[in-house]
């Protein structure tokens, strides 16, 4: 499962966090991204900008994790501001978002990303996900994509069945 994965860079301001994703946003980096966003939400950040200007490709697992946060953070909250915005996704990533029925979950921005001067840069550490964590994240991501767009059920039915069986086998192996 060793595959080049995304580099994540975080810039935080007083009321937002910007996560820059460089390289390949794939299944291998999905648990790190999910953990990062959850940690930032726990710290009180509710507005996220995901900078995709250097993201060359995104797979369905990463997109499913992104969609999970799109559903949670962009739910109507009366504030009028989306909780998560995508900045400068390339054509390939935009087409994937559209083809899998997830583009509507996000506000997309294009052009130069201008951030306030008072941002702090931090580089998150990897959680070094186990095979089980990657499998669970991938399963949940594909289930989300199936829930977002009924057309995805046919696309991911076999994948989710395989992942569920794999996860079950991994959990059995852990039992004493």
Say what each PLM segment does.
Residues 4-35:
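STAS-typified acidic loop motif
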Residues 7-10, 40-42, 65, 115:
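Short hydrophobic/aromatic-rich motifs at helix boundaries and adjacent loops
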Residues 10-14, 44-47, 70, 118:
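Short amphipathic alpha-helical segments, especially helix-boundary/capping motifs
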Residues 27-106:
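Amphipathic alpha-helical interaction surfaces in cytosolic regulatory modules
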Residues 93, 107-124:
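Long, charge-dense
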Residues 116-170:
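Charged/polar low-complexity intrinsically disordered segments, enriched in acidic residues
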Residues 172-176:
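Short acidic DE-rich linear segments
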């Amino acid at each position: 499962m060793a595959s080049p994965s995304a580099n994540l860079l975080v810039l935080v301001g007083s009321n937002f966090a910007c996560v820059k994703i460089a390289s390949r946003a794939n299944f291998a980096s999905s648990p790190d991204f999910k953990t990062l966003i959850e940690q930032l939400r726990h710290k009180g950040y509710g507005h996220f900008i995901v900078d995709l200007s250097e993201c060359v490709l995104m797979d369905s697992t990463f997109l499913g994790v992104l969609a999970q946060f799109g559903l949670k953070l962009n739910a109507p909250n009366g504030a009028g501001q989306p909780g998560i915005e995508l900045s400068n996704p390339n054509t390939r990533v935009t087409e994937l978002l559209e083809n899998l029925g997830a583009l509507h979950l996000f506000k997309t921005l294009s052009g130069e990303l201008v951030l306030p001067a008072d941002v702090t840069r931090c580089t998150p550490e990897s959680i070094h996900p186990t095979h089980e964590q990657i499998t669970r994240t991938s399963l949940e991501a594909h289930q989300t994509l199936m829930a977002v767009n009924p057309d995805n059920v046919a696309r991911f039915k076999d994948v989710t069945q395989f992942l569920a069986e794999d996860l079950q086998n991994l959990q059995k192996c852990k039992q004493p």
